[in-house]
Amino acid sequence: MSNRLQLTVPPEQSGQRIDKFLQEALPELSRSQAQKWLAQGMVELDGAPAGKNDRLKAGAQLSVLLPQAVQGEEEPDWEAVLHPQTEPQPQEIPLDIVYEDEHLLVVNKPKHMVVHPGAGNSEGTLVNALLWHCGEHLARCNGIERAGIVHRIDKDTSGLLVCAKDDLSYRGLAEQIQEHTVDRFYETVVYGNLKEDEGTIDLPIGRSLKDRKKMAVRLDCLQPDGTVEGARQAVTHYQVLRRYNGFTHLRCRLETGRTHQIRVHLAYLGCPVAGDEVYGPKKPIRRLEGQCLHARALGFTHPISGERLYFESELPDYFTSFLRTLVPREEE
């Protein structure tokens, strides 16, 4: 007896090797087990047998043949993985909707809200709110746990997200993210003062070798020919908006959208996001309630109508209140 698990590749994992994707999708699975399954033909990619060296595209469909757990074997209980006891339920949570039509909606996510359910976060997420607001009219090709979610921002990051109401719209938006045609602008306040008024950070990001729960710039993954192996290419453009004593107000544009990208890149330059308890200083000069990072603007092509759309959100109170406490830096 066996089960098949259906997986859809999200935009942020486009370009990833299939064995690494499987390992991240199924934490119980080791890399060697994933490669074994691929060698045994247990994984299909878009309807054809997958190869162990295949790299994935956003929206690609994986079908994984999972063995049934047998007492005495070391295989995890895949039945529990496939059919968890609970799935996200609709919850009447207020949404700040910036735009909505029959195919998609753009929401302004508040700080402290998790985007989708995960370990320790089964309620109060954006997905729970979307399930209440949209009901059955929500893209589910990426699973009910990520219903409607096209891209993510961190729990303690506020700002704009586009969500898909149907699978066709999801795939159209995911393709734009993969092709870097979605405009994503953030504003942040960082510790310290960047030397240049504007610049580009082009450094690969992967799991930290010191702490697997964190991300890090991985220069060791850069190959002589300029390609990246074992991490993911990440590009962040920044512009200084104003300098303060001990802090800098920045506008950032994402060319790629890797996990914690802005936070990791700026921390690597020695200017971590103010209030970032993961990548910031252990003893910051100012204590904040979470990180000062806001997804300020979002632009994309409507996946159905073809119209180019652009949205902006005001800086939230926590951000502007912090700015008012800072002392502008005198020009040298």
Language-model segment annotations:
Residues 1-332:
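RNA pseudouridine synthases
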